[in-house]
Amino acid sequence: MHMIDLKKLVGSKVRIVDIDDITYEGIVDEYIDAEDNVPEEIEAIILTDLLRLDDGKKFINPIEFKATEIISAYSI
């Protein structure tokens, strides 16, 4: 698995594929540095306006994705 620079995605609309091979689209609202993500110490991003493309489910609340849960992430 290659490293994705999650920090560069802040403010972008993105498509993410997670480790369960589920695809999402949303806006990257926030980046959390590994040092600030206690107790996991894993970098993460928080997405808003999230849509799970596999079944069309829309999420009302922001959702956090840890770097270890993301297979691919790119701006769309």
Give, region by region, the residue ranges found by the protein language model:
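Conserved RNA-binding domains used in RNP assembly and mRNA/RNA metabolism
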Residues: 2-76
